[in-house]
Amino acid sequence: MQNQTMSGSSVRSGSNEQNDKVVSSLKNLIEICHTGHQGYTTAAENIKNGEYAALFRSYSAQRHAFENELKQHVNRLGGEAESTNASGLLADAAGALHRGWINIKSAVTGGGIEALLDECERGDEAAVKAYQEALEQPFPQDIAQVVRQQYHSIQEAYTRVKGLARIEA
């Protein structure tokens, strides 16, 4: 087995417990990004406001890009990134996120723009919390930097959607 450190890109595939924890955390974030991608796609397809639809499409694309970026790190660490099962360290957060985005279809059909924005806000709030928990993990520096950048972008999206929800209320 190769020696593993927590700095730079030196964590390589292996079976040690720390590597497994990093892979598990990243897989949970992949699930969170995947669910956010789907939620924002659904929101964009079902909202009549063109400005909001464009914003939601951009957030959907962002989450898809984040998902792919995290998958690359999982693959580099020897994990299988194609699995999007929410199991491991952040399963509760991923489950809460999924439940938040599941309600998006109900909001589209029954509650109009306010309900839709509320559901987007809930989904991003759960994502922010999941990323905060993930950042407590001892990631290698390069992965920690990626997760931190994604966290800040999701936090900005959350703040923006929250503001739009207040305007529409």
Residue ranges and their predicted role:
Residues 29, 36, 66, 73, ...:
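Amphipathic alpha-helices that form helix-helix packing interfaces
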Residues 2-10, 72-128:
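Carboxylate-rich helix-loop segments that flank metal/cofactor sites and access channels
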Residues 21-29, 50-69, 89, 113-119, ...:
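Alpha-helical scaffold segments that form or flank carboxylate-/histidine-based iron centers
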Residues 15-48, 114-137:
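Alpha-helical bundle segments that constitute or directly flank the non-heme di-iron/ferroxidase center
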Residues 40-48, 77, 81, 108-111, ...:
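Secondary-structure edge/capping motif, primarily at the C-terminal ends of alpha-helices
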Residues 116-169:
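Preference for long, well-ordered alpha-helical segments
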Residues 53-94, 161-164, 168:
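Conserved alpha-helical segments that form or flank metal/cofactor-binding pockets of metalloenzymes
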Residues 1-23:
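Extreme N-terminal tail/first-helix region
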